[in-house]
Amino acid sequence: LVTMLIQTELGLKSRTTAEQIKKYPLGKVESLFHLRLENGAMQFFTESIDPRYYGHVVLLAPGEMLKIEEDIPMERILEVRREAKRKVFVRNAVRALRQVAPEHELRNIPNVVLVGGSAEDFEIPEMLMQALAEYRIVCGRGNIRGTEGPRNAVATGLLLSYIGNSQEG
C-alpha cells in the first residue's frame, strides 16, 4: 500500500522505483565528491562519484546508489514517502493498539515492542515512537530469542507454542 501511494503521488512509471523509495534513504549528488543527505547533512567521498549521478536525486541502497530517473525534488519525494508511511503504518498501529488496550485507552499501555520487517525500516520505528510518545508509551524494537533481531517473531511464537502444546499433551 505504501509503495502504491508513493508511485501514485509522485507519478512514477516504475513500481520498483516506488518500492526502492520506500526502503532506502535519499541523497542529492551536488558535486563529484559530495552529496546532500535527506537530513541536510553532507557526505564527502575521497573517490569521485560516477558523473552520471551528478545533479540527480539518488537512493542510498546498501553498497550502491540508485538514480531516480524522474526529475522530482528530493524534498517532495521525502514528504510523500513519510506521509505514505504515516498514513499506513502509524495510523494502523494506533488503531490496532486502541483495540487491544485496556478500556480501549492508549494511556493504559506502558510499552510496545516492534517486530517484523517494519521494525527494520529506517523511518517507521521513529515515526511510531513520536506518535506513541503522546500517550506516554515507551516503544522499542524486539530482538527475537536474543539473536534474530525483530524478524521471525510470528514464526518463532508459533513454533514455541506448538512445542509447548506437544510437550503438555
Model-derived features: where do they sit?
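Helical "lid/coupling" subdomains associated with nucleotide-phosphate turnover
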Residues: V2-T8, L12, G27-G169
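Conserved phosphoryl-transfer catalytic core
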Residues: L10-T16, I21
